[in-house]
């Protein structure tokens, strides 16, 4: 639960050996829905289960698509002069920028996400010092995942993307919304290949966000 009016359901998984044992999946889902009662609830569901989620009252918004690429053998990329690492003094502005691209203010989450040791965070600032983009990458069990990647335009998103992949070994994953054509251009330009997709759905109204700034969502599991 991010606020009193928005929450997100993720990690909705039951081990295969228990899937036909009792009503575990049903009870997990019911508990999540009861906990988030009164909220607009978001989720990224597997495409095969869309009709099941519709029966629970969820509305289809769009597909989020995971792309995979390899960059450790393609030379070094430079960091643009307008890109800087996380500075606590910028925290309020970062939270405000994030809110343009996410259905709820998520102050506590971002403070933890920004300070996680294995994450690398970069921010793009204009000549006046205003934040015009933000991107983070984290090491995973298999490779690295970028998320979020928000930017005012393609040029800024690309500069952040290139900064984030510097020195990263193994696969790099980026989860993009199909609603942003420029995000599709970015993954095509760097020869990333689609490997998975989900359906973004909401229990109530579909949030009005700055979709053209969303070049990569944070995670499938947390929104």
Predicted regions: what they are:
Residues 68-73, 203-206:
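Short beta-strand-to-coil "C-cap" segments at the C-terminal boundary of structured domains/repeats
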Residues 25-46, 50, 62-71:
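Glycine/small-residue-rich loop that forms an oxyanion/phosphate-binding "nest" at active or ligand-binding sites
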Residues 70-88:
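Conserved N-terminal entry element of GNAT/NAT acetyltransferase domains
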Residues 61-66, 193-197:
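Short hydrophobic/aromatic-enriched beta-strand-loop microsegments
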